[in-house]
């Protein structure tokens, strides 16, 4: 079904800074639970009005800048949204150049999702894409404000089409539903558009879940969901074309190739857009113009004008008058071409030109951007593109990977990008050019060439295609080799500048170039100790200490941290940290000793503190120890492990150490597995497993979580009933639990998921044939069905609780059922720390009085650091749901549950940073 449309638009043109508030409903399935997820942002800046015509962007050209704090994923998203507008209308989004005085800047402002309406006309203007705004449809919506559109429901005649429910609107947000004055907006003769991407959703600014703030009138005939954030509606497209007076003949062309045909007399305009780093070739193939006109030279009649860019002020590549020889090929210098045809007489609708975009070629510039074919969409199969970048002499080429996603392979044999350096006396290696190959997903990377020239070649095969890449290149100078280098110790060249560094035992002073004697140092000794500055007192802020410890050749260094308390969450060391060699950063507080053995006779230890919180710090002893394992494995049959002052032999899984403490023999094969995730394998894997073997693994993860087992390799002697060798998996803590399956042969078992926090696996082999065995990965998943008994059980928000914060984009559900008939479930929280937000729209806990997530069963939604009150179900079951978004994380929660007498009623509350009174019944329930 197709709907007519309209958007409230600037007339006389209105200037407004507008904040978009909406709810984007998405159904999420978690186990057997079905519920809605909401995204909201709060606040709106008061709007200002003007009657100046300058608020329309001249020629529909909108220059843009993207703030550097956005990731490559964000920049790819913004470009997709801009291309969406360009594809269906005649507006153009172009990277800002120095001559552009007025332009938009993608940024993050306190308003969340917000933008000015139309062109502000005072230099740069912000389009804020804040938290939870980074969705394709939301960015398209925000760009609608930039183009010149108000929210659809603010048009003066909206009361004929929608009802506003003010009692459901959040306090202080009523003004978001105010009607515009008739002199402020113009519908351009178009009817109301429920399908517009500029329309509010039914529960935008609602004061609670399932509250409606705006709905189509019952007699409107519209039954679909309003507030879509998927794509421009047909009404959006029509109104944009009216607002910017788009030519009826022509259009925007983004395909790799196509035809141009004059459909009628008058003006036809085509914008051809290709990815950056591509060249557009236009072939004029036929004559469709009338005889020469005296007005042709003025581009007023019977003329084809081809311009090298997007604007009528762009350089003219060619101008062809009627009667001229039309057959010719015209090439652009960039990735855009504008073709305009003016004719005085009707012409047959036949193609008069073809075009195609070619990737690659030489680039002589000191800065620029290169895109993969069809970017920001997926690149085509069988691509082969080569670019050669030349910058000024005596310079280097710096290439930044803004966005990069090609088909993954460990050797990049499918799709790949190859960077090859120009040969110079410094870049030769065995007489060959220096090259490097890339594929897969690369989040951030910068490469600097040795010379002023570098070649890039992109290949794709005929199978899997990804979204490609955006690369930015700039001319780079080695400032460390110039008189700009004022560093006291070391100068480290960076793209666009340099930074200073200090020798071991010194730290960089606040001026950024001098070095002060401080903590750290070079220690060549067999034993000693190191500690954080001021230990055992608090270490200072903004301090960096580096120690380099060296022992004699053939020795290892043992480190024993007897005290360790450094700001951080252990696995998330974003603030202060200790880094040992190339290992991960250490932080947090440890009450037990931390022991480390270095793989070589040298180790580098770095301590760094930020500008805020201090802790006690650390104290560590070190001692050099001779590595007996380096000589003939110290006589160990399987594995030799060096120990302080000695060594110890260990055996592979399924074997035990013999009496001589060096050789290995088959023995007990039972394993207790308590880590939340890891890998297991059959005895002697990847070699054949021994005959007559019986092994078992008992997996136990964090309470309130389940275990998922995935086999990555599987070769067990085959038999129809698995009578010889077999892997058996039980859904519980031992072999008496429910059997999940018995497996053998070459086909890996399916993904196995436990119903509780325990799983039991056995492996047995007979006395005959043996195979390679198996390798499996296990991980912990939140949620599941739990049984409440008289003794308490526990639910943890995440499997690594206390070691790290909960994860992003989590949707977990727990159904707790009382074991005894006639009993209910009582739940209380001993720890509660969920991202705080007034409406609990980002991260939250929901509790339902029953097994289903329905409005009438909702007890409340909770967030912040205030624990909910004790909750007891009125029936045998209770449902707990946890949702997290893609931004901030906190410590999480620990909930205790047990069976209890059923409650006669359950108070419905809504908790965020502070506790609110019980919710009123909704004015309009949702129809699910």
From Swiss-Prot:
Region annotation Disordered: where it falls in the sequence: 895-928
Record-listed E.C. numbers: 3.4.24.-
Bias-annotated ranges (Basic and acidic residues): 917-928
Residues annotated as domain EGF-like: 477-516, 626-665
Descriptive protein name: Zinc metalloproteinase nas-39
Glycosylation sites noted in the Swiss-Prot or TrEMBL record: 69, 87, 283, 527, 560, 694
Subcellular location: Secreted
PANTHER family given in the database record: CUB DOMAIN-CONTAINING PROTEIN, OVOCHYMASE-RELATED
A single GO molecular function term of this UniProt record: metallopeptidase activity
PROSITE patterns in the record: ASTACIN, ASX_HYDROXYL, CUB, EGF_2, EGF_3, EGF_CA, ZINC_PROTEASE
Active-site residues per Swiss-Prot or TrEMBL entry: 142
Pfam families: Astacin, CUB, EGF_CA, FXa_inhibition
N-terminal signal peptide: 1-30
Residue ranges, compositional bias (Polar residues): 902-912
Disulfide bonds: 90-246, 111-133, 113-114, 249-268, 359-385, 412-439, 480-491, 487-500, 502-515, 519-545, 573-587, 629-640, 636-649, 651-664, 669-695, 722-744, 782-812, 840-863
Enzyme class: hydrolase
Domain annotation CUB: ranges: 249-359, 360-476, 519-625, 669-781, 782-900
Keywords of this entry: Disulfide bond, EGF-like domain, Glycoprotein, Hydrolase, Metal-binding, Metalloprotease, Protease, Repeat, Secreted, Signal, Zinc, Zymogen
Cofactor(s) this protein requires: Zn(2+)
Organism: Caenorhabditis elegans
GO biological process, one term: dorsal/ventral pattern formation
Function as written in the Swiss-Prot or TrEMBL entry: Metalloprotease.
Peptidase M12A domain span: 48-247
């Amino acid at each position: 079904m197709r709907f007519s449309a309209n958007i409230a638009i600037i007339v006389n043109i209105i200037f407004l800074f507008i904040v978009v508030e909406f709810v984007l409903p998405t159904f999420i399935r978690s186990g057997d639970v079905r519920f809605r997820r909401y995204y909201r942002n709060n606040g709106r800046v008061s709007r200002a009005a003007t009657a100046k015509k300058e608020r329309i962007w001249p020629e529909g050209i909108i220059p843009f800048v993207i703030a550097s704090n956005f990731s490559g994923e964000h920049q790819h998203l913004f470009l997709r949204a801009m291309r969406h507008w360009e594809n269906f209308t005649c507006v153009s989004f172009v990277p800002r150049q120095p001559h552009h005085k007025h332009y938009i800047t993608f940024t993050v402002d306190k308003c969340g999702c917000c933008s000015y309406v139309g062109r502000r006309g005072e230099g740069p203007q912000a389009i804020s894409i804040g938290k939870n705004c980074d969705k394709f449809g939301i960015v398209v919506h925000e760009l609608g404000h930039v183009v010149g559109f108000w929210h659809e429901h603010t048009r003066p005649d909206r009361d004929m089409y929608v009802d506003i429910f003010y009692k459901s609107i959040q306090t202080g947000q009523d003004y978001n539903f105010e009607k515009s004055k008739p002199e402020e907006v113009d519908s351009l003769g178009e009817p109301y558009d429920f399908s517009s991407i500029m329309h509010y959703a039914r529960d935008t600014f609602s004061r609670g879940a399932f509250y409606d703030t705006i709905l189509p009138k019952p007699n409107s005939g519209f039954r679909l969901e309003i507030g879509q954030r998927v794509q421009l509606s047909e009404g959006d497209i029509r109104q944009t074309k009216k607002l910017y007076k788009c030519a009826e003949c022509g259009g925007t062309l983004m395909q790799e190739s196509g035809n141009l045909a004059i459909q009628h007399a008058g003006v036809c305009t085509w914008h051809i857009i290709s990815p950056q780093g591509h060249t557009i070739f236009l072939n004029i193939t036929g004559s469709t113009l009338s005889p020469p006109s005296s007005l042709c030279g003025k581009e007023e009649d019977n003329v084809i004008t081809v311009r090298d860019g997007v604007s009528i002020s762009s350089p003219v590549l060619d101008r062809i008058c009627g009667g001229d020889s039309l057959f010719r090929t015209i090439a652009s210098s960039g990735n855009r071409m504008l073709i305009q045809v003016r004719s005085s007489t009707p012409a047959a609708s036949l193609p008069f030109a073809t075009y195609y975009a070619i990737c690659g070629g030489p680039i002589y510039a000191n800065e620029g951007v290169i895109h993969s074919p069809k970017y920001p969409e997926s690149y085509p199969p069988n691509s082969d593109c080569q670019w050669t970048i030349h910058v000024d002499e005596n310079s280097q080429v710096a290439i930044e990977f803004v966005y990069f996603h090609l088909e993954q392979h460990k050797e990049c044999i499918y799709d790949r990008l190859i960077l090859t350096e120009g040969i110079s006396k410094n870049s030769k290696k065995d007489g060959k050019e220096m090259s490097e190959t890339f594929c897969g997903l690369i989040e951030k990377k910068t490469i600097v060439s040795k010379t002023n020239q570098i070649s890039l070649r992109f290949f794709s095969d005929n199978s899997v295609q990804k979204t490609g890449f955006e690369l930015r290149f700039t001319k780079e100078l080695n400032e460390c080799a110039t008189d700009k280098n004022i560093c006291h110790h070391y100068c480290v060249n960076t793209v666009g500048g340099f930074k200073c560094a200090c020798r071991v035992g010194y730290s960089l002073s606040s001026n950024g170039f001098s070095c002060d004697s401080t903590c750290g140092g070079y220690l060549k000794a067999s034993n000693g100790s190191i500690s954080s500055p001021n230990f055992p007192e608090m270490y200072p802020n903004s301090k960096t200490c580096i120690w380099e410890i060296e022992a004699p050749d053939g020795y290892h260094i043992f480190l024993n941290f007897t005290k360790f308390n450094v700001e951080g969450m252990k696995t998330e060391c974003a603030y202060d940290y200790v880094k040992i060699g190339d290992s991960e950063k250490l932080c947090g507080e440890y009450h037990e000793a931390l022991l480390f053995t270095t793989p070589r006779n040298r180790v580098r230890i770095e301590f760094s503190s930020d500008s805020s919180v201090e802790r006690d710090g650390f104290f560590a002893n070190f001692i050099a120890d001779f590595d007996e394992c380096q000589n003939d494995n110290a006589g160990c049959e399987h594995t030799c492990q060096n120990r302080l002052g000695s060594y110890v032999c260990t055996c592979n899984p399924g074997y035990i150490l013999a009496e001589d403490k060096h050789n290995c023999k088959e023995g007990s094969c039972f394993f207790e597995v308590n880590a939340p995730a890891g890998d297991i394998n059959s005895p002697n894997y990847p070699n054949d497993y021994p005959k007559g073997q019986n092994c078992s693994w008992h997996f136990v993860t964090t309470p309130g979580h389940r275990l998922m087992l995935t086999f990555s390799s599987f070769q067990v002697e085959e038999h129809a009933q698995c009578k010889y060798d077999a892997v058996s998996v039980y859904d519980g803590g031992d072999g008496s639990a429910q059997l999940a399956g018995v497996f053998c042969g070459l086909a890996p078992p399916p993904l196995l998921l436990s119903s509780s926090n325990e799983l039991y696996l056995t492996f047995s082999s007979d006395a005959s044939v043996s195979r390679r065995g198996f390798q499996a990965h296990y991980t912990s998943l939140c949620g599941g069905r739990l049984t409440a008994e008289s003794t308490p059980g526990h639910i943890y928000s995440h499997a690594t609780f206390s070691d790290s914060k909960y994860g992003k984009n989590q949707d977990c559900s727990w159904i707790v059922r009382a074991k005894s008939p006639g009993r209910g479930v009582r739940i209380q929280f001993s720890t509660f720390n969920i991202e705080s937000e007034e409406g609990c729209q980002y991260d939250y806990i929901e509790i339902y009085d029953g097994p289903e997530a329905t409005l009438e069963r909702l007890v409340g939604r909770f967030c912040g650091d205030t624990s909910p009150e004790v909750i007891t179900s009125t029936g045998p079951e209770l449902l707990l749901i946890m949702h997290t978004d893609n931004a901030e994380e906190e410590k999480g929660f620990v909930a205790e549950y047990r069976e209890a007498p059923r409650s006669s009623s359950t108070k419905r509350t809504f908790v965020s940073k502070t506790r609110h009174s019980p919710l009123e019944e909704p004015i309009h329930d949702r129809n699910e």
